[in-house]
UniProtKB/Swiss-Prot annotation:
Gene: rplC
Its biological purpose: One of the primary rRNA binding proteins, it binds directly near the 3'-end of the 23S rRNA, where it nucleates assembly of the 50S subunit.
Keyword Protease belongs to the record: no
GO biological process: translation
MF (Gene Ontology): rRNA binding; structural constituent of ribosome
Subunit structure: Part of the 50S ribosomal subunit. Forms a cluster with proteins L14 and L19.
Protein name: Large ribosomal subunit protein uL3
This protein's record includes keyword rRNA-binding: yes
Modification N5-methylglutamine, positions: 149
Similarity remark: Belongs to the universal ribosomal protein uL3 family.
Natural source organism: Haemophilus influenzae (strain ATCC 51907 / DSM 11121 / KW20 / Rd)
GO cellular component, one term: cytosolic large ribosomal subunit
Entry-linked Pfam families: Ribosomal_L3 (PF00297)
Posttranslational modification: Methylated by PrmB.
């Protein structure tokens, strides 16, 4: 089963049958329109390419416009691809949120909020050094980043200050609380990566 592309609306809470408050993220999943079907013969692998939403005509490039016209669909806000295994799709086909009606858990992928350049304490949860007792300059610095002559360098991947966020993040096995096909909404328990109105990819959980 493939996934779908949606938009993070925000968080709220609902109450279950026992009156317990459940925190949920609301994901709006408009119809995903098939723009290309990739086959083993033509592309070397099988996949389906989809778009969703809409884009102003003056924001669509000529190659994109031709691609959408060939598929016979309205220009969307982006293109996403899902690998397929035996499923049959046709150009212009619409895939809706109701495909998750029988799914218990999903994996959600999004782009995390960008935090800019951050230090080791915020970026890697390093402990701070002494506030007093002779320490006047090094309260939030990293400390040692390696050895001396041997190896005489800083190892790749060393946790240091740098850009935090604005990267692809996947949260696995989120419980599906409700599928509202009429309003094109999917409610999942807990939080998902990214800012409000950000695009997210929802797939059935691989570890379910």
């Amino acid at each position: 089963m493939i996934g779908l592309v949606g938009r993070k609306v925000g968080m709220t809470r609902i109450f279950n049958e026992d009156g317990v408050s459940v925190p949920v993220t609301v994901i709006e999943i408009e119809a995903n329109r098939v723009t290309q079907v990739k086959t083993l013969e033509n592309d070397g692998y099988t996949a389906v390419q989809v778009t969703t939403g809409s884009k102003k005509a003056n924001r669509v490039t000529k190659p994109e416009a031709g691609h959408f016209v060939k598929a016979g669909v309205e220009a969307g806000r982006g293109l996403w691809e899902f690998r397929t295994e035996g499923e049959e799709f046709t150009l212009g086909q619409e895939i809706n949120v109701d495909i998750f009606a029988d799914v218990k858990k999903v994996d959600v992928t999004g782009t995390s909020k960008g935090k800019g350049f951050q230090g080791g304490v915020k970026r890697w949860n390093f402990r701070t050094q002494d506030a007093t007792h002779g320490n006047s300059l090094s309260h939030r610095v990293l400390g040692s980043i390696g050895q001396n002559q041997t190896p005489g360098r800083v190892f790749k991947g060393k946790k240091m200050a740098g850009h935090l966020g604005a990267e692809r993040v996947t949260v696995q096995s989120l419980e599906v609380v409700r599928v509202d096909a009429e309003r094109k909404l999917l409610l999942v328990k807990g939080s998902v990566p990214g800012a409000i109105n950000g695009d997210v990819i929802v797939k059935p959980a691989v570890k379910a």
